[in-house]
């Protein structure tokens, strides 16, 4: 318990100066005087400070930044842009050394000398390795991460009421909904056995669609801490030059992505729930690759029916139906 309170104070002190600045901007209290205009340059500087702070505070806060980078309904565009760097610029030292997990789980079946680091995430690190003559990818959970995440989730839960003081009414609604789901989502994301199972299921669902690539898994190498999968290279989905090089218009790729996610949600009932640019790429032959299934979710038949009804109402412009 003492460790929790120390951590809470540490986090509070890190965010306190920026919190006061935001309150001052909006004149949330009389002692701050009239509200003031804040330039884009100042907002960018603050966004960079917040990004650096989340990196310093560790995996749970990095994950908060990653989620916020996909929520323009909560944070302004300048912050979305800066937080987006957390999608693929997380240093290996952001958590414990993942190599200890690789050595414990796979030393007998993988030649460790063939391991090459590829990318760092808030909860895991990705390597490539040689296995049975193939190049595979290993998503490895950071050691000790579960205890760290559980502690910091308590801290984040305690900070939400303070965060609401900085938000306007529209943002408050979005923040409360996000806070309610965030804890469940991140704890599920730590279960790599669940991820590899859902990944294989989604792969089966697209077996007849050669436009979509879901990397094949290696069940014998997967565990609660490791997801072993086919290594699939791709170009960033946001790189218009890369799309042009393979003969794809951005609108064409956007349509494919939309149709893919509609199929997952409305037809299959199991879907990849983290479609930020760091998790989507395009192959040299123009296929869409989807990575990282930790945030995948399921929809019940009733939920699918409700979403389908909503889309029909929107298409018909039926205001009363909404």
Language model features with spans:
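N-terminal accessory/targeting segments that precede structured cores
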Residues: 1-125, 131-132, 154-175
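ATP-dependent phospho-/nucleotidyl transfer catalytic cores
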Residues: 77, 84-88, 150-151, 163-271, ...
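Conserved beta3 strand of the Hanks-type protein kinase catalytic N-lobe
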Residues: 129-130, 141, 275
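Glycine-rich ATP phosphate-binding loop
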Residues: 134-142
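Conserved N-lobe beta3->alphaC-helix segment of eukaryotic protein kinase catalytic domains
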Residues: 143-158, 189-191
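Hydrophobic residue at the +6 position relative to the catalytic HRD Asp in the kinase catalytic loop
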Residues: 278-282
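Activation of the activation-loop gatekeeper triad in protein kinase-fold domains
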Residues: 292-296
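Long, amphipathic alpha-helical stalk/connector segments used for oligomerization, subunit docking
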Residues: 316-322
């Amino acid at each position: 318990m003492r460790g929790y309170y120390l951590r809470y104070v540490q986090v509070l002190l890190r965010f306190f100066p920026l919190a006061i600045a935001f309150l001052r901007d909006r004149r949330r209290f009389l002692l701050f005087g009239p509200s003031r205009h804040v330039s884009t340059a100042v907002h960018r500087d603050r966004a960079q400070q917040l990004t650096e702070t989340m990196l310093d505070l560790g995996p749970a806060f990095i994950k908060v930044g990653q989620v916020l980078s996909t929520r323009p309904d909560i944070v302004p565009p300048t912050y979305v842009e800066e937080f987006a760097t957390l999608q693929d610029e997380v240093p290996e030292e952001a958590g414990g050394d993942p190599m200890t997990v690789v050595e414990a789980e796979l030393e007998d079946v993988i030649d460790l000398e063939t391991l090459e680091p590829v990318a760092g995430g808030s909860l895991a690190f990705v390597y490539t390795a040689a296995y049975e003559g193939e190049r595979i990818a290993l998503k490895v959970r950071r050691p000790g991460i579960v205890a760290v995440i559980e502690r910091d989730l308590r801290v984040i839960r305690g900070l939400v009421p303070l965060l609401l003081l900085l938000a306007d009414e529209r943002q408050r609604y979005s923040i409360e909904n996000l806070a309610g789901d965030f804890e469940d989502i991140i704890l599920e994301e730590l279960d790599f056995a669940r991820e590899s199972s859902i990944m294989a299921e989604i792969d089966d669902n697209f077996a007849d669609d050669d436009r979509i690539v879901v990397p094949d898994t290696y069940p014998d190498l997967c565990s609660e801490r490791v997801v072993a999968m086919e290594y699939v290279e791709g170009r960033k989905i946001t790189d218009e030059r890369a799309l042009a090089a393979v003969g794809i218009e951005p609108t064409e790729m956007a349509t494919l992505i939309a149709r893919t996610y509609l199929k997952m949600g409305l037809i299959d009932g199991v879907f990849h729930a983290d479609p930020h640019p760091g998790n989507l790429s395009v192959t040299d032959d123009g296929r869409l690759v989807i990575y990282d299934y930790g945030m995948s979710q399921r929809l019940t038949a009733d939920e699918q029916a409700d979403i389908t009804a909503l889309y029909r109402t929107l298409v018909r412009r039926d205001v009363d139906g909404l």
